[in-house]
Amino acid sequence: MTNGNGTPPEAAAPPQLNVLAQYTKDLSFENPNAPASLAPQQSQPAINIQINVGANNLAENEFEVTLSIEGKAESGSTVLFSFELAYAGVFRIVNVPQENLHPLIMIECPRLLFPFAREIIASAVRDGGFPPLMLDPVDFVGLYRQNLERAQQQGQPS
């Protein structure tokens, strides 16, 4: 069966993911012990990073996805620096089956946002007087699965 122009119906409307906007929602960098924290350290600081993804349905086929990244660098009990970034994008997603929509929003959209968020953090840390912090790539599939498991254990919908 064809749709009148010789193509099968499923080929008539390919899935589409468009980035409509990207923006910093919130950015905070703290260097609470400067200038002492800028002195050379005896050892590598311990760096703790937390990453979360959130999404809101703005309109039919349009979603805001927010990538939240928080981090802290400590040397012993001294905080060298800390940061928080909420970086978001508005995405238009059409012709995607409903069962694939949630994973697409929570995996692929943050994967597209991450390089930009990484650069913002690297620049903020550098501008704070430290070497740029280059975040390692994030396994958004693993993060998605982890969040699904946590939601199921708590009896919440994903």
Swiss-Prot record:
Indicate the quaternary assembly.
Homotetramer, a dimer of dimers. One homotetramer interacts with 1 SecA dimer.
Which UniProt keyword terms apply here?
Chaperone, Cytoplasm, Protein transport, Translocation, Transport
Gene coding for it = secB
Family, according to the entry, reads as follows: Belongs to the SecB family.
Q: Which GO terms describe its cellular component?
A: cytoplasm
GO process terms (BP): protein folding; protein tetramerization; protein transport
The subcellular localization recorded is: Cytoplasm
Q: At the top level of its lineage, which domain of life is listed?
A: Bacteria
Q: Which Pfam families does this chain map to?
A: SecB (PF02556)
Transmembrane residue ranges: none
Q: Give the Gene Ontology MF terms in alphabetical order.
A: unfolded protein binding
Q: What does this protein do?
A: One of the proteins required for the normal export of preproteins out of the cell cytoplasm. It is a molecular chaperone that binds to a subset of precursor proteins, maintaining them in a translocation-competent state. It also specifically binds to its receptor SecA.
Q: How is this protein named in the record? A: Protein-export protein SecB
